């Protein structure tokens, strides 16, 4: 966030924030974002945490792994509490032979082993919602239709030569199978937002995996209400509330954030019939127990992200 009013709003509403250094294009870009994230943490240490990321620059260099681990060591010493990996791994970067670099590539193994040894979590936005591989008019929620209409570079239906949805999920699963000690938080319901049964299978298979629900609550709202409620109660220690939102002059307003928090709260806490601009038609709130709300809104962020 570039807006101090956002931090003040979070403090007033009892929220904590995590700033995610995102995009692995160059170390220069990462350094710029890292410095800003660190300054936010220093300004509001009780409210703001931050995650670093890894640079894919010089991927083919023999010492890339060593340099990357050294940089992560510095970042952890400087206060980073997690590592973010973004969808550009698997959807943008290519190896010297032209193949896409997936997260289960063996060159990542020593880096992931180092992160696990430091007991730091990886926050992984790997792949996209399954809607990404569908035509815009076949997508299940308006938010996806709007996003991919405006970001054709990430609309995989238009790029059949890119890795498939299953390729993305399988690469993530392979990575987790290779690194069972790695603490992993799958961003956006782990890109399994379309079917909580599929997500439950992964949570059962990978005990060190949790997911945040940021920017994917609408996908819960279009699934069977009782099934979703049972899923959240059963996996209450593996789900983290989040919004995937930031405030600057060019993004959402503080008022928009406050409205989003309120709308989400009604969905999780009441059994009222609700509407949302992100869902076509009405849906019923979940009316979750207070003990479950305490976990997904607070305790799990402490346990999984050290917030």
What are the roles of these predicted feature ranges?
Residues 9-10, 40, 75, 115, ...:
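Generic structural signal for hydrophobic
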Residues 11-16, 77, 298-302, 306:
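Sec-exported extracytoplasmic/periplasmic mature domains
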Residues 28-31, 62, 66, 102, ...:
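Conserved phosphate-coordination/catalytic loops
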Residues 156-160, 164-307:
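H/E-rich (His + Asp/Glu) clusters that bind or coordinate divalent metals
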Residues 2-5, 25-26, 57-59, 90-92, ...:
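Active-site environment of divalent metal-dependent phosphoester hydrolases
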Residues 32-155, 207-210, 217, 225:
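Active-site gating/metal-coordination segments in enzymes
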Residues 1-46, 66-67:
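An N-terminally biased module of ancient metal coordination in phosphate/nucleic-acid-related enzymes
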Residues 1, 17-20, 48-53, 83-85, ...:
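Hydrophobic faces of well-ordered beta-strands that scaffold small-molecule active sites
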């Amino acid at each position: 966030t570039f807006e101090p009013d956002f931090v003040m709003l979070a403090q007033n509403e009892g929220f904590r924030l995590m700033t995610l250094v995102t995009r692995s294009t160059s170390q220069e870009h990462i350094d710029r974002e890292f410095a800003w994230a660190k300054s936010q943490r220093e300004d509001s240490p009780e409210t703001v945490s931050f995650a670093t990321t890894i640079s894919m620059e010089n991927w083919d260099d023999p010492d890339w792994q060593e340099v990357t681990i050294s940089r992560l060591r510095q970042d952890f010493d400087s206060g980073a509490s997690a590592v973010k990996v973004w969808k550009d791994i698997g959807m943008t970067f290519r190896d010297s032979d032209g193949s896409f670099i997936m997260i289960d590539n063996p060159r990542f193994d020593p880096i992931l082993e180092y992160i696990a040894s430091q007991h730091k979590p990886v926050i992984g936005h790997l792949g996209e919602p399954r809607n990404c591989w569908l035509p815009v008019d076949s997508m299940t929620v308006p938010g996806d239709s709007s996003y991919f209409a405006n970001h054709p570079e990430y609309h995989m239906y238009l790029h059949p030569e890119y890795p498939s949805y299953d390729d993305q999920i399988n690469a993530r699963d392979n990575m987790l199978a290779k690194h069972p000690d790695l603490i992993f938080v799958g961003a956006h319901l782990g890109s399994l937002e379309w079917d909580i049964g599929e997500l439950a299978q992964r949570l059962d298979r990978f005990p060190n995996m949790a997911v945040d629900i940021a920017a994917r609550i609408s996908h819960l709202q279009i699934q069977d209400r009782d099934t979703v409620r049972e899923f959240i109660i059963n996996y209450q220690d593996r789900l983290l509330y989040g919004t995937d939102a930031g405030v600057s002059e060019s993004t959402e307003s503080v008022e928009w954030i406050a409205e989003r928090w309120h709308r989400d709260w009604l969905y999780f806490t009441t059994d009222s019939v609700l509407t949302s601009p992100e869902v076509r038609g009405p849906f019923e709130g979940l009316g979750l127990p207070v003990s479950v709300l305490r976990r997904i809104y607070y305790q799990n962020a402490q346990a999984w992200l050290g917030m």
